[in-house]
């Protein structure tokens, strides 16, 4: 290491503070800052009874299906029964963790009275906010600027907030837009604090159609709002000018204002960059108030090094923030997720700083909303149900982490089990690393053993003791560097944070000062591309490499619990509604990540996770294996079309009275369980139906492709990336100094697939079912087989169920728009359906014996 790097200083863990209460009586137990409430027993018991009835009827239904084969369509019958069994097993795995839902309540007034007493400095813990910006070409810089402004204007002590924006593409446009946002923040933040406006993303705030004059707003507020809106319009003009200029990339690359080339002209080969935008000494807003800190970060990238995408960027920010600000908690956001509730950070602190459960809470996952109200079923049903067990899963954004949990430590209850162990025993436990207990043993050893060399004493015995301490010190340092990396400043901050967190209140934020030059140099070092080599980053500490769900899974496996927070006003909201291409691309990425976790040797919930309960494990298995259900679902959606076009059936033609009653009761139990689930979750029926249609579209497209991509990636190491462009586009900017050979080598392990390719399967399914419905009805009317309308009605009902789920997708596919619909997807679908039908007729003409006409004549 460089000689100017900071030395590791001795770290002493302070004794825990005595518990205090709001009344001031030391003997009183402090009031909790949050509580978990169960769903009313009447609603929950009815829901459980409906699920149990559905399970019993499913067992009877499968007994009927297995014992009543269809002789003239044996292959179709076997296929349909196999699909039904597969889908039923998937439903059961996902249903069992959903039997104990819970609701959370936070007490912001108690948080304020405990940590923000009048006349005293705020003792709320420091929070480092990470904003991930991946590609400025797809993510408008105005969206990133709004996200940053909403974070900086949050209702939280300014000295306790530090915002880090990671630019994974090293784009000069992102840097310039953040520079403009930092200047606008000096006026926007005091405006929000003076008037308490919501939301605090200026684009979302000024887009609200509210008549403030009708509400008799104060004249000063109306005047300030008009002036601020005028300034924001000017800010948008400057941002749009930057975006327009960025489309014309100079041949020699971008040049900064001082005449030097932009270091990130080559997005795949550039040095690390860190710039302090807010937080210099004397930085004040227009009202003279303190400003939060804002940093621009772009990690180093070199050919030949794996960068691990978003997880690698988050780990880089975790190390940089530890060196510069070292907040006790970390909140990560995507660049298009704005803070919609200014009290979001306080809501998170109600869980993290809770005197009862705070030491066992690894992260708080917030609900993520958009203007269309999507994902209501996932957040308001599935996440609440997991919250009743060990906690919700991590979904990749809108999550507040404990830094201690990210570093691989175990919760306080597990960490305090063996505090009487000596130093030698500690070393024996931590020599191999990879376990939370070894990390906690190291923490105790670090607090017990000074980290600076002791001076030799005259006494021989003291010299021997000093020599032994130095040997142990070298061993500890080597072990720490193998685990965390070769950065004394980062290692010291890791154990400093633990001592501060164990003090009881999570520590108080330091004053806003500009980082020393030596700290910035160390921060540059910890984001170098070679820093993680031969360390445990991405395997045991930080964000796990292999999928976002794996990060929360590893924490739960160590014994931590998590919390789900969904305040009345959503904490975070998407800047703009996602396009269909972005929806499919996002669904594809999540499904591929889920398959990667399921097939992982380290993070698979099927066998990993020593401290997971059965229901929590089933919740993770359901979350990781959901793409597999796309295989039977796609086949089952195609079966009605096959039956209508061939005159075959997957059910026996003679249905007894008992069989009919069983089928009716099964359908009733399905409807009852869904209705009761919507009742206790308060999810509107319209939102549920929208989620069902989206589930069908993504299951037959993105999830179906993800199954093969996951298997391909696990077997060959080839990753498949999806592009939201319908045609090949030129590179974003020139890669100076990188010839074609190096570029091909960088892309050798990645296959790019356009999003329109995902539309072939759902388009084929809906076209085949529509063709089957039209052909079957026309054939029945033309030939007068009215006695067969009963059997035909069942087939039409199944085909109608498929078409009803995909009709929104079909309307969107054929709707008029600025550009033509993806013709290639429609053509491939029609060709696929036609070829499949002809092959069936060709095979049936040689295999089926000649028979007299019946009411079940093949239509083709």
Swiss-Prot record:
Keywords: Cell membrane, Cell wall biogenesis/degradation, Cellulose biosynthesis, Coiled coil, Glycosyltransferase, Manganese, Membrane, Metal-binding, Transferase, Transmembrane, Transmembrane helix. The keyword Cytoplasm does not apply. GO terms for cellular component: plasma membrane. It is a multi-pass membrane protein. Disulfide bonds: none annotated. Binds 2 Zn(2+) ions per subunit. Gene3D superfamilies: Spore Coat Polysaccharide Biosynthesis Protein SpsA, Chain A. It is found in: Cell membrane. Residues 453-465 have a biased composition (Acidic residues). It catalyses: [(1->4)-beta-D-glucosyl](n) + UDP-alpha-D-glucose = [(1->4)-beta-D-glucosyl](n+1) + UDP + H(+). Pfam families: Cellulose_synt. Residues 223-249 form a coiled coil. It comes from the Eukaryota. GO terms for biological process: cell wall organization; cellulose biosynthetic process; plant-type primary cell wall biogenesis. The chain crosses the membrane at residues 44-64, 73-93, 627-647, 658-678, 702-722, 758-778, 790-810, 824-844. This is Putative cellulose synthase A catalytic subunit 11 [UDP-forming]. It comes from Oryza sativa subsp. japonica. The gene is CESA11.
């Amino acid at each position: 290491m460089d000689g100017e790097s900071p030395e590791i200083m001795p770290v002493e863990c302070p004794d825990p503070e005595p518990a205090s209460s709001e009344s001031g009586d030391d003997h009183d137990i402090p009031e909790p800052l949050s509580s978990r409430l169960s769903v009313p027993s009447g609603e929950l018991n009815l829901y459980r009874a409906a699920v149990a009835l559905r399970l019993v009827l499913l067992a009877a239904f499968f007994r009927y299906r297995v014992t009543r084969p269809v002789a003239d369509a044996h292959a179709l019958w076997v296929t349909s029964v196999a699909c039904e069994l597969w889908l039923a097993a998937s439903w059961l795995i996902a249903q069992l963790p959903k039997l104990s839902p819970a609701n959370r309540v936070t007490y912001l007034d108690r948080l304020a009275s405990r940590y923000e007493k009048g006349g005293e400095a705020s003792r709320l813990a420091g929070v480092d906010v990470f904003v991930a910006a991946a590609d400025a070409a797809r993510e408008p810089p105005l969206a990133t600027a709004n996200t940053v402004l909403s974070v900086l204007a949050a209702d939280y002590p300014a000295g306790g907030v530090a915002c880090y924006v990671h630019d994974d593409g090293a784009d000069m446009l992102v840097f310039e837009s953040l520079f403009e946002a930092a200047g606008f923040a000096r006026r926007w933040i005091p405006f929000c604090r003076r008037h308490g406006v919501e939301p605090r993303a200026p684009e979302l705030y000024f887009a609200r159609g509210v008549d403030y004059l009708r509400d008799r707003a104060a004249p000063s507020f109306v005047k300030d709002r008009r002036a601020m809106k005028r300034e924001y319009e000017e800010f948008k003009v400057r941002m749009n000018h930057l975006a327009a200029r960025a489309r014309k990339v100079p041949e020699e690359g971008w040049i900064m204002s001082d005449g030097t080339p932009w270091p990130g002209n080559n997005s795949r080969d550039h040095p690390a960059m860190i710039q302090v935008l807010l937080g210099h000494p004397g930085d004040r807003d227009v009202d003279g108030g303190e400003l939060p800190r804002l940093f621009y970060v772009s990690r180093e990238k070199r050919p030949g090094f794996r960068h691990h995408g978003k997880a690698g960027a988050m780990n880089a920010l975790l190390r940089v923030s530890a060196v510069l600000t070292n907040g006790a908690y970390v909140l990560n956001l995507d660049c298009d997720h704005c803070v919609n509730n200014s009290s979001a950070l306080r809501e998170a602190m109600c869980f993290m700083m809770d005197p009862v459960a705070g030491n066992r809470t690894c992260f708080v996952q917030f609900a993520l909303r958009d203007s269309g109200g999507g994902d209501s079923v996932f957040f308001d049903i599935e996440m609440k149900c997991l919250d009743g067990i060990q906690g919700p899963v991590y979904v990749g954004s809108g999550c507040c982490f404990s830094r201690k949990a990210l570093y691989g430590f175990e919760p306080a209850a597990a960490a305090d089990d063996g505090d009487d162990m000596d130093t030698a025993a500690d070393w024996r436990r931590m020599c191999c690393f990879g376990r939370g207990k070894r990390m906690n043993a190291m923490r105790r050893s670090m607090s017990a053993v000074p980290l600076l060399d002791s001076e030799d004493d005259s006494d021989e015995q003291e010299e021997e003791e000093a020599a032994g301490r130095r040997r142990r010190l070298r061993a500890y340092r080597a072990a720490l560097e193998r685990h965390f990396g070769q950065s004394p400043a980062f290692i010291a901050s890791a154990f400093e944070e633990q001592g501060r967190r164990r003090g009881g209140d999570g520590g108080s934020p330091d004053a806003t000062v500009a980082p020393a030059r030596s700290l910035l140099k160390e921060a540059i070092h910890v984001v170098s591309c070679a820093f993680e080599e031969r360390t445990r980053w991405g395997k045991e500490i930080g964000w796990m490499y292999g999928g976002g769900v794996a990060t929360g899974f590893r924490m739960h496996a160590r014994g931590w619990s998590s919390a789900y927070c969904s305040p009345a006003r959503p904490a975070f909201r998407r800047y703009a509604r996602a396009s269909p291409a972005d929806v499919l691309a996002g669904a594809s990425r999540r499904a591929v990540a889920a398959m990667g976790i399921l097939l992982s040797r380290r993070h698979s919930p099927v066998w990993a996770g020593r401290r997971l309960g059965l229901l929590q494990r089933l919740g993770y298995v359901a979350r990781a294996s959901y793409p597999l259900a796309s295989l039977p679902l796609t086949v089952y959606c195609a079966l009605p079309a096959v039956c209508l076009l061939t005159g075959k059936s997957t059910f026996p033609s003679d249905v007894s009275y008992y069989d009919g009653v069983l089928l009716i009761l099964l359908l009733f139990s399905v409807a009852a369980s869904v209705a009761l689930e919507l009742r206790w979750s308060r999810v509107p029926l319209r939102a549920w139906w929208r989620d069902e249609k989206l589930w069908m579209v993504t299951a037959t497209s993105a999830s179906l492709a993800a199954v093969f991509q996951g298997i391909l990636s696990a077997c060959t190491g080839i990753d498949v990336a999806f592009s939201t462009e319908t045609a090949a586009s030129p590179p974003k900017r020139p890669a100076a100094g990188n010839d074609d050979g190096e570029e091909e080598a960088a892309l050798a392990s990645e296959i790019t697939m356009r999003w329109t390719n995902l539309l072939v399967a759902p388009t084929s399914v809906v076209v085949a079912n529509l063709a089957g419905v039209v052909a079957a009805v026309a054939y029945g009317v033309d030939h007068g087989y009215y006695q067969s309308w009963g059997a035909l009605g069942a087939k039409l009902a199944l085909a109608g169920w498929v078409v009803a789920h995909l009709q929104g997708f079909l309307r969107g596919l054929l709707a008029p728009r600025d550009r033509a619909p993806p013709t290639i997807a429609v053509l491939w679908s029609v060709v696929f359906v036609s070829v499949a039908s002809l092959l069936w007729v060709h095979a049936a003409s040689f295999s089926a014996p000649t028979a007299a006409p019946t009411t079940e004549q093949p239509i083709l």
